[in-house]
Design a protein with these regions (language model features):
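Post-signal-peptide, soluble extracytosolic/periplasmic N-terminal scaffold domains
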Residues: 2-18, 28-291, 600-668, 678
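Short, ordered, surface-exposed loop/turn motifs in non-cytosolic proteins
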Residues: 60-69, 73-83, 693-703, 775-789
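A short, amphipathic beta-strand motif
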Residues: 68, 297-299, 687-691, 765-774
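Short, acidic Ser/Thr/Gly-rich low-complexity loop/linker segments typical of extracellular
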Residues: 80, 704-713, 790-801
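Short Pro-Gly-centered beta-turn/loop motif in secreted/extracellular proteins
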Residues: 88-97, 331-336, 712-739, 751, ...
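Conserved, compact domain cores that house catalytic/ligand-binding motifs in diverse enzymes
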Residues: 164-228, 369-444, 466, 472, ...
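Feature captures outer-membrane beta-barrel proteins of Gram-negative bacteria and organelles
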Residues: 165, 193-207, 234-251, 387-401, ...
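Transmembrane beta-barrel strands of outer-membrane/channel proteins
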Residues: 176-180, 212-216, 257-263, 373-377, ...
Length: 881
């Protein structure tokens, strides 16, 4: 475990201050307090100026690097805060709140535009915000500000107002997901090797995000059947750039501008591919309780399988999953419309089905408007445009008392549709919405069953509710009925292109997602249900229902039993069955289980062992029977710093042997440096961490830790857009010769941003040294020793003794007091073997030690102990600043 003595030494002067005067406040006592410095038992004639401690709340004028806390919530970055003496009473000092700092408060627009400034517009003028209090807690290097909520924009836990959003830095991103599979048939048949992948490359320039998506597939098949007339080798390969696009955030409008190839994401109309542009209110910019629904994809894999999620032919997600039930919940709420799910089993079987992502009731806060404006040309796969120029718009207006009115229009020369709806926030009873959409379509008479035009209506009702008291949620429940002649834009385009009216004419759609946890009973229920009926073909029903029960069995705790029933239907073929699992703990981080899968003509049962090695690694082994044949399979997963790695292997007696490998990661490169890393959302938001060049520093975000590379850089990719994300150093796993004087950073990043945050980390050996000036004296008590990176590596104790961290052979350091570098020291090269035997270090005077004036607030505010000049007195700030 690393020694953190440096941290304790750094706060020593502030601990003395705290002991003498309590916390520093903007309200002070009138009388000064006198102290006897003899209690410090300093040797010789050492003097300490305790003037700054003799008045409660006094902070010596100068510059301080502090963490700013607004209403107990720290802002994302540290700030240089200047303190200056009061005009009427020099024993009091005041903080300068710069426009840059005040902009981070999230003040309401009418409040912010009426603020007045002093000191050449460098400091907030006093007395404007009644009830505002400022406290300096120097023991924690913090500036604590209390501000009435009435002045601030709407906030939510872990969500910041637009004033704190960070567009990040410019850079290059390249993310990928690669899946490789090999399969050998035991009794003839085909051996196959396949590699598939998809990813995103792009550039960030200021607020702009430019991206290109790609997908590829390589498949080699060799027949082992000599009697097969088609025996031999066959290779198929393809590479496609599937999409080119760009976007940027418009924070003042709480909207997003998107250009290029896109998929129409609408709360009212069905989606389709197009090339053009759009401006839309971005739900991600809204507080969490107002955001949309993120798709939840569930299914059951009979063996280790590759799951591919695509939309209109474009792969948007691909991963490997072990045998058993699975849920994919990290697609994000920007994915909408109809998704195609393909499950490729290791035994060669393929399951396919479609799901329609749900839309939450299109509600808006009273007095606000949510909107989308889009235009362009519809597009087929392969960047080919089809159809005429179209345009569309939709909006939701929060009227009052929980009511919202919404509607929209979409169309081109031959197709028009319009919608109107109303929504109601029922408070504790949830939210409900109802709308009707009318379509008018012109087609050639040959394609419309003898009709030149079609007119139809579609009716929809949706409901959403969180039952917090019951620990349950109806994520979505909805019903939609469409008349026979109603057409969506996508169906119109298909009909125009093929010269015939669609098949699979939608009639009714039911959809529901439900989740409930009965904590006292140890029971949880999950349900996902969709049912489609059509005017011209048979209905389709898909569902997945899971029931789990947790209980104790004697001395064995946390035993669980679960049952999953499922049905997935596609192209008149259905996969249905039941999956049963019983598991119990085996040691601290392991479980043993029995799993049975029954249905669809294939029954299997397995005994399994699951073990979590650490936060980043787990594996699973299964042995059992399938179709009366022995089966053995294994699955391994590791969330590494460079990539997420999944590996699987399967053996089925007399049938086949297979193996699979999945890699998901990326690379980020900026002017500040870059790193290879794992990734979750292709081309998405990330945070570049700089550990001052120190390698192997463990940094954690929302997932497993990543470690800095040889250049001291790492990328945390599991961050959320427009959320207050936090990354921190795991101090218990720091390298032996590393010290972290700052271990937590925060960032609220716009979509696709490359955030940049720097940790104060010192690397090197530790030493106990004695500093001596050229006249034989020593630097004063409390003097700071800094390296060439201006990192404080030690504080001078009595008689020139100092504990140094981050010591390196031949390194140059400077000693500061009164805010100025007075002398320099040079460490020997090589360093002596014993660094704790009072290493004597001469400190050479710099010669010019005059105080330095800060250009940022010149001339009214001076660095550290320099007093404000009498000829240019600052405007004093009242105690209620």
């Amino acid at each position: 475990m690393p020694d953190h003595s440096l941290f304790r030494l750094r706060i020593l002067p502030w601990c003395i201050a705290l002991a003498m005067s309590g916390s520093y406040s903007s309200v002070w006592a009138e009388d000064d307090i006198q102290f006897d410095s003899r209690f410090l038992e300093l040797k010789g004639d050492t003097k300490i100026d305790l003037k700054r401690f003799s008045s409660q709340g006094y902070v010596e004028p100068g510059k301080y690097n502090l963490q700013v806390q607004l209403n107990k919530q720290p802002l994302a970055e540290e700030y240089d805060i200047y303190w200056y003496a009061g005009e009427d009473d020099a024993s009091k000092s005041y903080a300068c709140l710069t426009p840059e700092l005040v902009a981070q408060f999230g003040l309401k627009e009418d409040v912010a535009k009426n603020l007045q400034w002093s000191h050449d517009a460098k400091c907030l003028k006093s007395g404007q915000l009644e009830g505002m209090e400022i406290k300096a807690d120097l023991s924690q290097s913090a500036l604590v500000i209390s501000l009435p909520q009435a002045y601030l924009e709407y906030t939510w836990p872990d969500w910041d107002p637009p004033s704190r959003w960070d567009d990040g830095i410019s850079g290059i991103v390249a993310d990928y997901s690669i899946n490789a599979q090999t399969r050998h048939e035991e009794n003839g048949g085909d051996d196959s090797n396949e590699i598939s992948g998809n990813g995103t490359v792009g550039v960030n320039l200021g607020p702009w995000r430019m991206r290109a998506d790609w997908q590829t597939n390589y498949q080699h098949t060799r027949s082992n059947d000599d009697d097969d007339e088609f025996s031999g080798d066959e290779t198929q390969k393809k590479w496609e750039w599937s999409r080119y696009y760009a976007w940027r955030a418009l924070p003042s409008l709480k909207a997003k501008l998107a250009l290029g190839e896109d998929y129409l994401r609408s709360d009212i109309f069905d989606g389709f591919n197009y090339v053009g542009g759009s401006v839309s209110t971005d739900d991600q910019m809204l507080p969490p309780n107002l955001r949309g629904y993120a798709p939840d994809i569930s299914g059951v894999a009979h063996t280790t399988a590759k799951v591919t999620v695509s939309q209109m032919g474009r792969v948007i997600y691909e991963t490997q999953v072990p045998a058993g039930p699975f849920r994919i919940q990290d697609l994000g709420d920007s994915v909408s419309g109809t998704l195609h799910i393909r499950i490729e089993e290791q035994n060669g079987q393929v399951q396919e089905y479609d799901i329609s992502t749900a839309s939450m009731p299109y509600l808006t806060r009273p007095g606000q408007v949510r909107y989308k404006i889009m235009m362009g040309r519809p597009q087929e796969w392969g960047h080919h445009v089809e159809g005429e120029f179209f345009s569309g718009a939709e909006a939701s207006w929060g009227i009052a008392n929980g009511w919202s009115l919404y509607g929209g229009a979409l169309g081109d020369e031959n197709y028009q549709s319009a919608a109107l709806g109303v929504g109601r926030d029922l408070s504790t009873f949830g939210a409900v919405a109802f709308d009707v959409t009318h379509s008018h379509t012109k087609l050639d008479k040959d394609t419309a069953y003898g009709k030149g035009s079609l007119d139809g209506n579609s009716f929809r009702v949706s409901y959403s509710k969180d039952f917090d008291q019951l620990n349950s949620r109806v994520t979505f429940a909805g019903y939609r009925f469409s008349e026979e002649n109603f057409m969506t834009m996508s169906e119109y385009l298909d009909a125009s292109d093929s010269g015939m009216v669609r098949t699979g004419n939608d009639k009714e759609m039911y959809t529901a997602t439900y989740n409930q946890n009965f904590r006292d009973a140890g029971v949880s229920v999950y349900l996902n249900y969709t049912r489609h009926t059509y005017w011209d073909r048979e209905e389709q029903t898909n569902y997945n229902i899971m029931l789990s029960h947790y209980f104790n069995m004697g001395s064995i705790r946390n035993v669980s039993i679960s049952m999953t029933g499922y049905r997935y239907e596609y192209d008149n073929q259905a996969d249905k069955g039941m999956y049963i699992s019983l598991s119990m703990p085996w040691g601290d981080n392991s479980t043993v289980s029995y799993n049975g899968n029954y249905g669809s003509g294939t029954d299997s049962s397995q005994v399994g062992y699951f073990s979590r090695v650490d936060d980043a690694t787990h594996y699973q082994l299964n042995v059992g029977t399938s179709d009366k044949h022995t089966s053995v399979d294994g699955y391994y997963s590791h969330d590494g710093s460079l990539a997420q790695v999944d590996f699987s292997a399967n053996y089925h007696e007399g049938q086949y042997t297979s193996a699979g490998l999945s890699l998901q990661g990326g690379a980020t490169l900026t002017a500040h440096g870059g790193a290879l890393h794992r990734t979750q959302n292709m081309g998405g938001t990330r945070l570049l961490i700089d550990a001052d060049g120190v390698a192997d520093v463990p940094v954690e975000g929302n997932g497993a830790a990543v470690y800095t590379n040889m250049f001291g850089k790492a990328v945390v990719s599991d961050v959320n857009n427009y959320y207050r994300n936090q990354a921190y150093i795991d101090l218990n796993r720091l390298p032996e010769n590393a010290e972290a004087t700052q271990s937590v950073v925060q960032a609220t990043l716009t979509e696709g941003a490359i955030g940049y945050r720097k940790f104060a980390v010192i690397s090197g050996q530790k030493a106990m040294a004695v500093l001596r000036l050229s006249d034989g004296s020593h630097p004063p008590f409390g003097a700071e020793v800094k390296n060439d990176n201006e990192q404080t590596v030690g504080l001078v104790d009595d008689d020139g003794n100092v504990y140094l961290a981050g010591v390196k052979p031949g390194e140059h350091m400077s000693v500061f007091w009164s805010g100025v570098a007075h002398c320099d020291i040079n460490l020997p090269d090589p360093l002596p073997a014993d660094l704790f035997n009072g290493l004597l270090l001469p400190c050479q005077h710099k010669g010019n030690v005059a105080p330095i004036t800060s250009p940022a607030v010149k001339p009214a505010i001076q660095e550290q102990t320099q007093r404000v000049t009498p000829t240019e007195p600052p405007t004093s700030i009242s105690v209620n600043q």
